[in-house]
Design a protein with these regions (language model features):
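Structural marker of alpha-solenoid helical repeat scaffolds
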Residues: 105, 139, 173, 190, ...
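Canonical tetratricopeptide repeat
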Residues: 81, 115-116, 149-150, 183-184, ...
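Canonical positions in the second alpha-helix
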Residues: 101-102, 135-136, 169-170, 204, ...
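Extracytoplasmic and endomembrane cell-envelope/extracellular-matrix remodeling and assembly machinery
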Residues: 1-138, 142, 163-166, 210, ...
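Primarily a tetratricopeptide repeat
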Residues: 97, 131, 165, 182, ...
């Protein structure tokens, strides 16, 4: 709040115009905190997990200039965050150097391994991506994003059959992830499982809230699976589609 007042120039920030005396308010809060028992005041908090989530959010979604300033440190998470931001800005060489530095600093950190592997997957270095993502999965059995990109890497390297169990694992954890359903559908289509492919394209459209595409893929899935071994999978889709259709029609 103080920073806003310092940066405002001649104009008064809207917040301060309705909430004056920020300094007094801060002093009041500090006085109240000092009245707490020592056990509470001196309590230690492990915020390492929070910092890791914060790094991923800033790296993936934050304003790039502000994020790079935030990641000015030399620790592994800062280097990883810088790599994520530089990758978004298409500074591939600088991003690769940042990820390499992060890996040197934390070679056994599954988060660093996953984000570095994802970066190399996106820039087309499948061999490097495979090794990094495999290590990330071994170190963190619950990292479903690492599994998702590992499955996509298998697809890209002509091993779609091997990718199938990874997609199903991810979808058990995040059953409404539209991008996972879409990638899985394309993988299924590449190995000739057309009926299931249309089913998952329909799921992708449903969870993307794309009514027009959902209707189209639902009809195609129905036609392909009506008298096949995939009819049970279609019945599950049918229930989901009908429920979502009711919501769309009530709007």
């Amino acid at each position: 709040m103080r920073q806003k007042s310092w940066m405002a120039g001649a104009s008064v920030p809207a917040y301060l115009s309705t909430h004056p005396d920020i300094g007094d308010r801060i002093n009041g809060i500090q006085a109240r905190l000092s009245s707490f028992p020592a056990a509470i005041r001196n309590r230690s908090f492990d915020n390492r997990r929070f910092k890791r989530v914060q790094t991923v959010l800033w790296g993936r979604y934050g304003d790039s200039q502000a994020a790079l300033q935030r990641f000015s440190g030399k620790d592994a998470l800062s280097c990883m965050g810088s790599g994520m931001v530089l990758s978004r800005r298409n500074n591939v060489r600088e991003a690769a150097a940042a990820f390499d530095q992060a890996l040197q600093l934390a070679p056994k950190d599954p988060l660093v391994l996953r984000e570095a592997g994802t970066f190399h997957y996106r820039k087309g270095d499948m061999a490097r991506a495979e090794g990094l993502l495999r290590q990330a999965m071994q170190l963190d059995k619950n990292d479903f994003m690492a599994r998702f990109f590992y499955a996509r890497m298998l697809d890209e390297t002509g091993r779609a059959q091997q990718a199938q169990p990874y997609y199903t694992e991810v979808l058990r954890a995040v059953p409404e992830a539209a991008d996972v359903h879409e990638a899985y559908a394309r993988s299924l289509g590449s190995i000739g499982k057309t009926g299931l492919a249309y089913i998952h394209m329909a799921y992708s459209a449903i969870y993307s809230n794309n009514r027009k595409l959902a209707e189209r893929y639902f009809k195609q899935a129905k036609a392909k699976t009506e008298k096949s071994a995939d009819s049970a999978a279609f019945r599950k889709l049918d229930a989901v589609y009908k429920e979502r259709k009711e919501i769309w029609e009530d709007r």
